[in-house]
Each structure stands twice: as C-alpha cells, then as structure tokens.
From Swiss-Prot:
Keyword match Cytoplasm: yes
EC top class, as a word: transferase
Gene3D superfamilies referenced in this protein's UniProt entry, alphabetically: 3.40.1280.10, tRNA(m1g37)methyltransferase, domain 2
Catalytic activity, reaction form: guanosine(37) in tRNA + S-adenosyl-L-methionine = N(1)-methylguanosine(37) in tRNA + S-adenosyl-L-homocysteine + H(+)
Alphabetized PANTHER family for the sequence: TRNA (GUANINE-N(1)-)-METHYLTRANSFERASE
HAMAP family listed in its UniProt record: TrmD
Subunit-structure text: Homodimer.
Entry EC number(s): 2.1.1.228
Name of encoding gene: trmD
Keywords, comma-separated and alphabetical: Cytoplasm, Methyltransferase, S-adenosyl-L-methionine, Transferase, tRNA processing
Job description of the protein: Specifically methylates guanosine-37 in various tRNAs.
Molecular function terms from GO: tRNA (guanine(37)-N1)-methyltransferase activity
Keyword Oxidoreductase listed: no
Name this polypeptide is given: tRNA (guanine-N(1)-)-methyltransferase
Length: 250
C-alpha cells in the first residue's frame, strides 16, 4: 500500500475540487500521496453540440451515455495511468462498497473510476471495459460523481501518511467489523452531562476495555447484521453481555 493515482471519467470534473482542495484528501494530494485526474467525455466528441448521450433503444424515459466518448476518454486515461489500472463503474447495480472492499482497493497503485449520468451508460462499454461495479448504497443518485468521491475519500484514509495520527484509520468504524465507540472532548461537564469517568482515569487498559464494550454494544443495537459475519472472541462476548446487562439495568 503506497501512493495512489485515481483517474475519473466524468462530465463534471469541477465537482472533484471537493476532493483535491479540501480536507484529508487535499492534504494527501499536496503530500504527493494521492493524484486525481479527470477526463471529460465531452472533450472526445466531434459534433458541435458535444453530444455524449442519446435516446435508449426500445424506448423509455431519460438518456443513455454513448460508448464512443467514454471509450476515447478511457483510452486517454489508460495511456496516462498504465494499462494495468483497474476500471470501476459506480453503479446502483454494483456490489455494496464496504470497508473490507476499500482495503482491497487501497492496495492498488492506480484506479480508473467511471461516473455515469442520465439513465446510465451503454451496457456494451461495461461489458468491454469495466472490471468491477460498486455501489455506495441502495438508493438512486443523479450521477456517479458523489459515489466516486466517497470511494476516493475512503481509500485515501488508508494510505500511509494520509491521516494526522497513525492509529486513526485503524480505529475508524468498520475497520474491525464494528461500529466506533462514543467520543468526547472538553469540557468535562456540559449541560449537566458528564464525560464517562473511565475516560478521565488515565488507565489505558480500562479505557480500551470500555471502548471495546461500547463498540460492541453500539454495533449490536444499530447494525446487528455486522455481528452475524464476525466471530466474537471470548472477551468480546463477555463485554457484549456486560453492556446489555448494564443497559437493561439502567
């Protein structure tokens, strides 16, 4: 896992300034850990209207992105990044993007992301060129740009040196298959609500145990499905039972 180059084929390259100019991803760009390059299919059209879409065969609402501008943009992206780059189409039909999948993508040196628009892109382009399809959730968006930015942000967090603290990525939600524990900062008391005493104790073993217990309990209450695919250790089972006991007694 090292530096990452991401090439994005998009009709709205300006949207990706949110990645290159703000936050952790911007810092990664400035540090040379991340490179983001956009390719606009409109730049590969030959008609005066720069047409990138057309009506779907068989009828129906909306428009479909044409193959040729997408294919020509992909050729340019491949020439710039190398033929081995994995091509990913952001699509509601794709597999759901998980932290485990993000870890796999972070192992790549380069990615080419296809951000569709309208009713989608011509299926023949997908069959000929796309290696993987990924979805960020079971809902419909206006285009693939936001999912592409979500993917870039998630992958960037795993690049060595991208985060301010070496442990930050490892302690994120889902990294260990669990939701994150609650977090607190100063003041210790606000509107009569106190920070849990254990976090002020300075006892790192007790703090670690409390955080794991909260993480397990939160996952059980909010995303029990995550526990179905995770084998709990003896300590984790004990902590979850303790959490549920304390919850029921309160």
């Amino acid at each position: 896992m090292g530096n990452l180059r991401v090439d994005v084929i998009t009709l709205f390259p300006e949207m990706f300034s949110a990645i290159t100019e703000y936050g952790i991803t911007s810092r990664a760009v400035k540090q040379g850990l991340l490179q983001v390059t956009c390719w606009n299919p409109r730049d590969y059209t030959t008609d005066r209207h720069h047409t990138v879409d057309d009506r779907p065969f068989g009828g129906g609402p909306g428009m479909v992105m044409k193959i040729k501008p997408l294919e020509d943009a992909l050729v340019s992206a491949r020439q710039a990044t190398g033929a081995s780059a994995k091509v990913i189409y952001l699509s509601p039909q794709g597999r759901k993007l998980t932290q485990q999948a993000v870890k796999g993508l972070a192992e790549q040196e380069s990615l080419i992301l296809i951000a569709g628009r309208y009713e989608g892109i011509d299926e023949r382009f997908i069959e000929a060129h796309v290696d993987e399809e990924w979805s960020i959730g079971d809902y419909v968006l206006s285009g693939g740009e936001l999912p592409a930015m979500v993917l870039i942000d998630a992958v960037t967090r795993l690049l060595p040196g991208a985060l301010g603290h070496v442990d930050s990525a490892e302690e994120d939600s889902f990294t260990d298959g669990l939701l994150d524990c609650p977090h607190y900062t100063r003041p210790e008391v606000y509107a009569d609500q106190r920070v849990p005493d254990v976090l002020l104790s300075g006892n790192h073993a007790h703090i670690r145990r409390w955080r794991m217990k909260q993480s397990l309990g939160r996952t059980f209450e909010r995303r029990a499905d995550l526990l179905e695919s995770r084998s709990l250790s003896g300590e984790e089972k004990k902590l979850l039972e303790e959490y549920l006991r304390e919850r029921d007694d309160s």
